[in-house]
Regions:
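Interfacial segments at transmembrane-helix termini and the short loops linking adjacent helices
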Residues: 49-79, 125
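Membrane-interface helix-loop junctions in multi-pass transport and translocation proteins
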Residues: 51, 65, 95-98, 108-139, ...
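Hydrophobic/aromatic residues within transmembrane alpha-helices of membrane transport systems
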Residues: 14-17, 26-29, 33, 54, ...
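Membrane-interface junctions at transmembrane-helix termini in multi-pass inner-membrane proteins
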Residues: 76-106, 146
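Interhelical loop/hinge segments that connect adjacent transmembrane helices in multipass membrane
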Residues: 13, 21-24, 149-160
Length: 160
């Protein structure tokens, strides 16, 4: 939640900085956003470690058992989602969203059969693994495009 509060205003501020070609500000903001994301991931690790205790207090001891693997996979999914948001927010601010539109569509097409396959193979964990995979892919391409945009080397699909 804290990460979302920090990252939300970056979109419109990036638009202004990109139009004015103030790439130094974008780089500093990207660096700060990454630091907030890393801090959030660190807090997430602590939350995973304390999850059994918290679940017991919240839901009642012995009422339900949520495995560390389920909690850990949700943590990984949320971590990759935050990493994607660091770069995706900058990309959205530049307005260069054509690659995002195409790649998100491709990833959505991949996700459904992947989630079904992994769910049949691993149950709930399979669906969570599919989430981790698609957000890891989103993170990878968005980091690539964002770095190209900031370094002003984006061409083709990355600059549309």
């Amino acid at each position: 939640m804290i990460f979302t509060i920090v990252i939300t205003p970056v979109w419109s501020a990036t638009t202004d900085a990109y139009v004015r070609k103030v790439f130094e500000w974008i780089n500093k903001t990207l660096s700060f956003s990454r630091k907030v994301c890393i801090a959030s991931v660190f807090i997430g690790v602590l939350m995973v470690l304390a999850s059994k205790f918290v679940y017991g207090m919240w839901l009642g001891r012995g009422s339900i058992d949520i495995s560390y693997s389920t909690t850990g996979l949700i943590f990984l999914y949320i971590s990759f989602e935050m990493l994607y948001k660091v770069y995706g927010t900058i990309i959205n601010g530049t307005g260069k969203v054509f690659a995002q539109m195409i790649l998100t569509g491709i990833i959505a097409i991949i996700y459904i059969p992947l989630a079904i396959f992994l769910a049949n193979l691993c149950g709930l964990s399979g669906v969570l693994i599919a989430n981790v995979i698609v957000f890891a892919l989103n993170y990878a391409w968005s980091k690539l495009q964002c770095n190209k945009l900031i370094s002003q080397t984006a061409t083709g699909i990355w600059n549309k």
